[in-house]
């Protein structure tokens, strides 16, 4: 062919500067785009062979070579795919690819991040000009009678096309890097980028430093491959040593057999895994393979708890693996990573428009070739097809958890402490997920037993009730007979604790009366139980110290009206707190002197404000929502009796303060000032005992 000069477009003067500036932070995607093009060319050539339109050599193996040359400031990306004719170069490179890149830039250059294309996928061949001042293409088509073509463009409006000198079918793209992007010709940087985007592409990718000295390795002669380049044959005779046998005679014993080896040019090792685990059927994968894949992809050497293998062909093609990572403590980061792929090409991490937000706490890979990638993020949010994908993933996660709870409750309970933040967050974020999983949420109780909400709310069989519970049930029945028949039934109460150590006194009281409470000690629990109450009107949650249940009281005692009045005056004066509510009750446990209860609503609001403040969200002062406090004194306790009988004693104010602080300690830590006074007062009380 004769040399040809052409113009890309009369409007192209601004294209390349825009590409370089607009995608400044994502320059490395050119590797993904160009290697993907090469991978597509190889896939198409294989399809032509399968269709009988072309005959590949028997030893054909598709591969992509990346050659970096820091001295020459060049990168070469070579594939042995179907190649192009001069007309095809003219059509696809100078027109279609350029037009596509132009449309791509014009459409999205002024958009906000929410309107950008995910992963900037689709810029294609012209992504090369993000890093190069000049790009050349050498190509030879598979079509019979084709001649090699050389195309070049220096980033301006013109290109040049002429006869090339390529001998093998395929395409070689050479990038002449600009001075700002020389890092990409560094072998280690190139490896990093290729492994980031191309670790699982379906065609083997090889990286080498151009003109680097050859490296060698030694192999057994029997392991020689047809593709090996032999440098030297090495024969090593057997080695013998003189040893004494069982008869005490000396003889020559072979200690190393003869070896026939070959010194060969070091075999290249592909950077990628062409058949990642998610492309296989779940029944073909072993537990160890799942764990190894997890370690390799996420560099996390703590074993995952379990995983979900997604494998769907209809109505859309979606494959992937989602892992539930182990979280050691509440303070561990539970931010996960979901990697999105398209035909084994990495697009981006944590695309919330495609993957439900609560799944971002997991780690995993999702490959969906049907996903529309040439649209903006905002368009994806309203895409019905994408919504179906999101719903499918959510359903599979819920099905896995429900199935485990039904068929392997022991394992489900073992994993629960790690997976509960994820499930509760999912319930807060996804109503359908919550509806599906609601009856399979576990609650650990104060007896270290795991129960679902239906199990907690189920009535206790008569033969399982304690004497105290039976008596309370009888009392409740009598009270019910005297109530208005039209009155709405009271909600079932689920009692809970947030700190088993601090609230130990209340737990002891509950256990003594055969009562139960669940443990809710994660910072997500306040929001979670609030949502459960909003969605269900037949039960409520109440912290164990929010009120004294009738089961803890002894109703047979004397009237306490006068005692309440007297002790209320004593404690309000001693504590200098006229707003404090003081009650006197006959508690069944005489060892308990005082109990402080805080209103559930006020304390829960305080917890929410603290959580927002801890998250850097600002907001109102938690003290604005101080929970109403009630100090309950036990009339059956000897110390309370002493205070009642000796209200004018000089030591009573000190005892009153001490009882209040002891009750407070079962609810929350004392402030620095309160603790200082508490310690001094404790010492003073002990001194009294010495006199």
Where do the PLM segments sit?
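GHKL (Bergerat-fold) ATPase N-terminal catalytic module, capturing the glycine-rich phosphate-binding loop
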Residues: 1-185, 192, 199, 215-222, ...
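GHKL/Bergerat-fold ATPase module in large chromosome/replication-associated machines
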Residues: 117, 135-158, 178-181, 188-691
């Amino acid at each position: 062919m004769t040399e040809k000069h052409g113009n890309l477009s009369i409007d192209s003067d601004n294209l390349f500067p825009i590409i370089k500036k607009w995608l400044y932070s994502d320059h490395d995607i050119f590797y993904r785009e160009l290697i993907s093009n090469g991978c597509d060319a190889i896939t198409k050539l294989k399809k032509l062979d399968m269709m009988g339109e072309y005959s590949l050599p028997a030893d054909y193996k598709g591969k992509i070579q990346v050659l970096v040359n820091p001295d020459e400031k060049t990168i070469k990306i070579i594939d042995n795919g179907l190649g192009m004719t001069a007309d095809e170069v003219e059509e696809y490179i100078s027109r279609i690819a350029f037009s596509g890149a132009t449309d791509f830039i014009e459409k999205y250059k002024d958009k906000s991040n929410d309107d950008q294309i995910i992963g900037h996928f689709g810029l294609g061949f012209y992504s090369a000009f993000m890093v190069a001042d000049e790009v050349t293409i050498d190509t030879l088509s598979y079509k019979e009678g084709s001649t090699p073509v050389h195309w070049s463009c220096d980033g301006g409006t013109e290109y040049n096309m002429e006869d090339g000198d390529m001998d093998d079918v395929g395409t070689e793209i050479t990038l002449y890097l600009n001075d700002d992007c020389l890092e990409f010709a560094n072998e280690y940087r190139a490896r990093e980028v290729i492994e980031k985007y191309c670790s699982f592409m379906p065609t083997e990718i090889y990286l080498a430093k151009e003109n680097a000295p050859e490296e060698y390795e030694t192999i057994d002669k029997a392991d020689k491959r047809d593709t090996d380049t032999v440098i030297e044959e090495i024969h090593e005779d057997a080695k013998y040593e003189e040893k004494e046998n069982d008869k005490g005679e000396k003889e020559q014993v072979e200690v190393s057999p003869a070896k026939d080896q070959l010194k060969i040019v070091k075999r290249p090792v592909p950077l990628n895994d062409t058949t990642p685990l998610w492309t296989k059927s779940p029944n073909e994968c072993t537990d160890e393979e799942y764990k190894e894949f997890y370690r390799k992809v996420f560099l996390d050497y703590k074993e995952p708890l379990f995983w979900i293998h997604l494998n769907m062909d209809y109505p859309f093609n979606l494959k992937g693996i989602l892992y539930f990572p182990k979280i050691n403590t509440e303070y561990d980061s539970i931010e996960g990573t979901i990697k999105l792929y398209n035909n084994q090409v990495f697009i981006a991490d944590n695309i919330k428009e495609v993957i439900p937000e609560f799944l971002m706490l997991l780690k995993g890979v999702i490959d969906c070739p049907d996903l529309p990638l040439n649209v903006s993020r905002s368009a994806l949010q309203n895409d019905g097809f994408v919504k179906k994908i999101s719903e499918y993933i959510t359903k599979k996660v819920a099905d896995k958890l429900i199935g485990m709870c039904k068929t392997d409750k022991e394992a489900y309970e073992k994993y629960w402490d790690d997976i509960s933040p994820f499930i509760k967050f999912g319930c807060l974020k996804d109503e359908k997920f919550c509806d599906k999983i609601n009856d399979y949420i576990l609650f650990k109780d104060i007896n270290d037993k795991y129960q679902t909400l239906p199990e907690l709310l189920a009535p206790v069989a008569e033969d399982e009730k304690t004497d105290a519970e039976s008596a309370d049930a009888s009392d409740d029945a009598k009270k019910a007979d005297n109530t208005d028949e039209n009155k709405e039934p009271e909600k079932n109460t689920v009692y809970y604790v947030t700190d088993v150590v601090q609230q130990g006194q209340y737990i002891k009281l509950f256990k003594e009366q055969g009562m139960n409470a669940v443990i809710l000690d994660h910072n997500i629990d306040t929001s979670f139980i609030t949502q459960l109450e909003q969605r269900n009107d037949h039960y409520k949650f109440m912290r164990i110290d929010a009120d004294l249940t009738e089961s803890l009281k002894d109703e047979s005692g004397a009237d306490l009206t006068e005692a309440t009045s007297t002790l209320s005056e004593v404690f309000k004066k001693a504590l200098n707190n006229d707003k404090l509510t003081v009650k006197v009750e006959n508690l069944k446990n005489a060892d308990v002197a005082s109990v402080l209860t805080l209103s559930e609503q006020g304390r829960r609001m305080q917890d929410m404000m603290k959580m927002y403040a801890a998250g850097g969200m600002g907001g109102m002062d938690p003290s604005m929502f101080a929970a109403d406090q009630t100090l309950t004194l036990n009339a059956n306790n000897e110390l309370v009796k002493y205070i009642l009988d000796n209200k004018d004693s000089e030591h009573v104010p000190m005892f009153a303060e001490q009882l209040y602080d002891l009750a407070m300690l079962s609810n929350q830590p004392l402030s620095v000032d309160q603790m200082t006074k508490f310690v001094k007062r404790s010492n003073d009380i002990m001194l009294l005992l010495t006199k």
